[in-house]
Structures are given as C-alpha cells and as structure tokens.
Amino acid sequence: MVLRNAWTVIIYVILCSRSLADCVVDHVHLSGSWGSAKFTVEVADTDAERARGLMNRASLAKFASMLFVYDGPQQVGFWMKNTSIPLDILYFTAEGILLDIRDNTIPGDLTVLRSSGPVQYVLEINAGLAETLNLGEDTILNHARLVQGKKTLACR
C-alpha cells in the first residue's frame, strides 16, 4: 500500500512538473479541439512596447509570435501601420479564451481592427496560421502571465 501511494505521488509530481514547464514566459501554447501549437513569444506589456508591436520588422519566424498583455480586460484595436508582415491577430479574454480572429491582415493598412468585446491578451502570429491550424472558439491561450493573481486556465 505504501509503495502504491509513493508511485501515485511520483506520477502526480511528474505530471504537474510537465504542466508547469509548458507555462513559461518565452513560449505560448494554443490548444483546443483542433489540437495544439507552441510558439516562441515576445511579450509587449508596457504602453511603449504595445505601441511598437511588430512594426518595422522584415520577417517573423513561422512559429514566432508577439503577445500583448493589458492590465485588465478592455476593448482594444490594432492597425498595421509600419508593419510589413501580414499577420493573424488573435484576441483572448482574461481567462485565456479566444474571442476573435482578424486573419490575413494587410501590411501597412490603417484600418483599426477592434476586438468585439473586452480582452486582456492579443497574440499576433503569421498570416494564415489561424486557418492552417483550424483555430476555433474553443482555443485556449496558455502562458505564464498572471491574471488577477491567477494563471490562465491551462497554467493552473
């Protein structure tokens, strides 16, 4: 009986360690009924970083991304000014649930692409990846950033 309990504890620790290892600052994971994907990520969490975003960059590696983090849920808008990379823009709630996708944005376009409701995270990825991965409304954002003292759903 003691041996069985010891193995249970060991397996639990391994599973928890693996789960926590997936929630790191330099990577973001998306998951849903479609499967999952891992991206390297740059975090933009100050006004200056969010304003600059991916402007004036010539390229973005296939599974690279930028995560915009806001202090609290709010309606946000993005444009493609000085951005030469076509992007998919993914808007996530404070709980890390996908709310909107603005796909295949046009480089240099000044049209403001607003979220349909309050969001706390926005993830920019290369254009076409949202469709290729078949991202849907059940997509969850996994990242180490805290939300009101709690981790996003998949990082708990």
Regions flagged by a language model, labelled:
Residues 1-3:
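N-terminal secretory signal peptides that target proteins for export/translocation
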